């Protein structure tokens, strides 16, 4: 089967991502039980547009944003040209659905999802992923999230998750803090079926090493479309059980304050390091939609240090570091001993 996109590639990916947005919003409204999404449709002067949906002040979600966009133009931003110079001079098309959920309860993690598709002349690729940012450490929740996304990847190829997991650890890393944004998940970009899976720049990282060991997988357009479809569908099964397990847990003012403090790291990553934010701002995207990922409340505290051995301390020391969450028996024993397994 040809690796090249079908003639209806743009319409097909657009419809997939619209359906993903609709499905997520419908289910999140049912889960929350109180608030509803409001929708704003918008147009981009240079070409394209989208629809932004936001749910605020729900029973579970303090804020939830689910965006769809379909944009196109003639002038590519420098961030794309530097990665794929052969795209220069071609008209381009990009579509994507992105989501960030900020729950009220500190025991329910923040979650992020993004799946996207890009074309410019002979150049095309899929990208995407999902990642979890807990504020309090529970290894069982982390394992469940990773397992669901591992299963979704393996439906296309059993080797994909071996690269996408460490690639996610690498991408969602705050270099200025020397810590991960959360416990990771999956991340992939520039996937067009050619070359090795890993397309990042860190040749010292585990994603690069795993990708080199695996070699080329010869995936075609349909395989990569199915990957986006499978992973998008895995979101609810990866996250809803965590909500159901944690939503009835009472929390203190201090635990809420720690959640807001850790949300500050989320803000720092999105404004300083996130390529999607940078791309959106460089291409004159809709600013309100681009910054929808930011939490409604966050706080910073100079020189904060958690009490040694506290759950806040264990979150900071262990759950902001890349780990083999699913298979590390030493980590499992440590979490059981310190009451942070379940």
Swiss-Prot record:
Cofactor(s) listed: a divalent metal cation
Subunit: Homodimer.
Transmembrane segments: none
Underlying gene: hemF
Binding site for substrate: 98, 114-116
Pathway(s) of this molecule: Porphyrin-containing compound metabolism; protoporphyrin-IX biosynthesis; protoporphyrinogen-IX from coproporphyrinogen-III (O2 route): step 1/1
Region described as Important for dimerization: 266-301
GO biological process terms on file: chlorophyll biosynthetic process; protoporphyrinogen IX biosynthetic process
Oxidoreductase listed as a keyword: yes
Upper taxonomic lineage: Bacteria, Bacillati, Cyanobacteriota, Cyanophyceae, Synechococcales
Domain of life, per lineage: Bacteria
Pfam families in the record: Coprogen_oxidas (PF01218)
Native source organism of the sequence: Prochlorococcus marinus (strain MIT 9515)
Listed GO CC annotations: cytoplasm
Important for dimerization (site feature) positions: 176
Name the UniProt record assigns to this protein: Oxygen-dependent coproporphyrinogen-III oxidase
């Amino acid at each position: 089967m040809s690796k090249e996109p079908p003639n209806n590639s743009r319409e097909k990916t657009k419809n997939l991502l619209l359906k993903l947005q609709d499905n997520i919003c419908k289910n999140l409204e049912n889960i929350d039980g109180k608030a509803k999404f409001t929708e704003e449709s918008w147009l981009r002067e240079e070409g394209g547009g989208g629809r932004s949906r936001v749910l605020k002040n729900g029973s579970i979600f303090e804020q939830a944003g689910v965006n769809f966009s379909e944009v196109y133009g003639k002038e590519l931003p420098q961030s794309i040209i530097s990665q794929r110079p052969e795209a220069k001079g071609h008209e381009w098309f990009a579509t994507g659905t992105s989501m960030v959920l900020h729950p009220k309860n500190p025991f329910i993690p923040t979650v992020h999802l993004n799946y996207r598709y890009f074309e410019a002349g002979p150049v095309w690729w899929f990208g995407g992923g999902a990642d979890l940012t807990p504020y309090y450490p529970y290894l069982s929740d982390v394992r469940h999230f990773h397992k669901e996304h591992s299963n979704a990847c393996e439906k296309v190829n059993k080797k994909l998750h071996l690269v996408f997991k460490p690639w996610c650890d690498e991408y969602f890393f705050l270099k200025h803090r020397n810590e991960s944004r959360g416990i990771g998940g999956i991340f992939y970009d520039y996937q067009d079926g050619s070359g090795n899976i890993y397309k990042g720049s860190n040749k010292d990282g585990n994603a690069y090493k795993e990708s080199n060991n695996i070699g080329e997988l010869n995936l075609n357009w349909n395989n990569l479309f199915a990957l986006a479809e499978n992973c998008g569908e895995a979101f609810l099964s990866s996250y809803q059980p965590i909500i159901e397990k944690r939503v009835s847990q009472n929390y203190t003012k201090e635990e809420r304050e720690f959640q807001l403090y850790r949300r500050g790291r989320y803000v720092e990553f999105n404004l300083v390091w996130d390529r999607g934010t940078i791309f959106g701002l460089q291409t004159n995207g809709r600013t309100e939609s681009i910054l929808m990922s930011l939490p409604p409340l966050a706080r910073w505290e100079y020189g904060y240090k958690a009490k040694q051995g506290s759950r806040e301390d264990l979150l900071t020391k262990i759950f902001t570091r890349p780990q083999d969450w699913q298979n590390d028996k030493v980590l499992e024993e440590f979490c059981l001993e310190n009451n942070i397994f379940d």
